[in-house]
Design a protein with these regions (language model features):
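Short, histidine-centered active-site or binding-site loop motifs used for metal coordination
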Residues: 53, 172-176, 239-240, 326-328
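Outer-membrane beta-barrel pore domains
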Residues: 24-26, 59-61, 80, 103-107, ...
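Hydrophobic alpha-helical segments, especially transmembrane helices
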Residues: 5-6, 119, 277, 324
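Generic cytosolic/nucleocytoplasmic N-terminal low-complexity/intrinsically disordered segments
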Residues: 3-4, 19, 31, 53, ...
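Outer membrane beta-barrel
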Residues: 35-175, 186-188, 195-203, 257, ...
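Active-site cleft segment of glycoside hydrolase catalytic domains centered on the general acid/base Glu
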Residues: 180-184
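Cleavable N-terminal export/targeting peptides
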Residues: 1-31
Length: 334
């Protein structure tokens, strides 16, 4: 292995947050409605937004760039106490406009949810984090390359347990992503996730996913956990991916990091110190095929990365973070 590149990044995140009421009916972002004391404002939509701007300097190339990584706007609300909705669009995902979420969510009985539409499927820990929830300037390889899946379908969610709260999620999906929604499918594409919260500090997540983007079925398995104590957050995740009929080599991906928060009194509310190691072996998305041989081709090559960073947080009511990250990538010689 040789060191291939390193980068210095400056990232500013602006997030608009809204306050929550205190009643048993929820919309996608946690708004609660008192069914017995409905008010007109209960049905007013809420607007949320995230802007991420980034400056990168590539030391090996001695080159730099500015980028609007995200400019997300979402609308959430309720049309009935047990019917919520969400629509989210990114006006600048590295310069491209993307429709991310568009779904309705039902709360038929206590602790049960039914979500139908376009959404992120229940799989992995890190891939489920929105931009404002991420710890680093760049997402992990699991969150961006290996386990990042949005699709159209239906998801069921159920929560139970008091001593050890458990959240179960599972659903059926097209399996062809966001753009090919008119295609008919004979194969079954599914994803499921179970989360266990031990002592309110240790979270264990188990996930499984099976999709068939083209001719080859791809099965993925993920296990991850994070532990929070004092000012520390420690997290680790492992993903394993296989291809039917040995159409491509099995894929391994790892994400591990630690975060320490230091409260501050002036200017910044806190300063966070972070360190991360993540890696992935070469993978195919199941769509790229060699025209001559018909075999799957590589879409993402094997790599390792070490990241160190400091995050300065300005506000609690409106989350505003200034992230300074230094990354080193390691690629194979060939």
């Amino acid at each position: 292995m040789i060191m291939k590149k390193s980068a210095f990044m400056l990232l500013i995140i602006l997030l608009s947050l809204t306050a929550n009421a205190q009643t048993p009916y929820h919309n996608e972002d946690g708004k609660k409605i008192d069914k017995e004391e409905l008010e007109t404002k209960d049905y007013l939509p809420e607007i949320h937004g995230t802007i991420r701007t980034k400056f990168e300097y590539q030391t090996e190339m001695a080159a730099s760039r500015f980028e609007v990584r995200n400019a997300r706007i979402s609308i959430t609300g309720n049309v009935l106490p047990i019917v919520a909705y969400k629509a989210e669009i990114d006006l600048s995902d590295e310069g491209q406009i993307k429709m991310l979420d568009a779904y309705a969510r039902l709360f038929p009985i206590k602790d049960l949810t039914v979500t139908a539409g376009q959404m992120r499927v229940p799989f992995t820990i890190d891939a489920h984090r929105s931009p404002h929830q991420q710890y680093f300037a760049n997402r992990s390889f699991i969150a961006k390359q290996v386990g990042n899946v949005r699709d159209v379908g239906v998801t069921l969610g159920y929560k139970f347990g008091t001593g050890i709260p458990v959240t179960l999620e599972g659903g059926l999906y097209n399996g062809s992503g966001l753009t090919n929604q008119k295609e008919w499918h004979k194969e079954v594409n599914y994803s499921a996730k179970a989360q266990f919260l031990f002592a309110k500090k240790l979270n264990l997540a188990l996930s499984i996913q099976s999709i068939q983007p083209q001719e080859v079925r791809i099965n993925s398995y993920d296990i991850g956990a994070f532990y929070e104590f004092g000012r520390f957050h420690i997290e680790g995740e492992y993903l394993y991916k296989t291809y039917a009929d040995n159409a491509y080599d099995n894929v391994h991906a790892v994400n591990s990091f630690i975060n320490y928060d230091l409260p501050l009194q002036k200017v910044f509310s806190k300063m966070s110190f972070l360190a991360r190691y993540d890696m992935m072996t070469s993978q195919s998305d199941g769509k790229a095929i060699n025209e001559e041989t018909g075999a799957l081709t590589t879409t993402d090559y094997k790599r390792h990365r070490i990241t160190g960073g400091i995050t300065f947080s300005l506000s609690k009511a409106f989350r505003t973070d200034l992230r300074l990250n230094y990354e080193k990538y390691f690629y194979a010689k060939n």
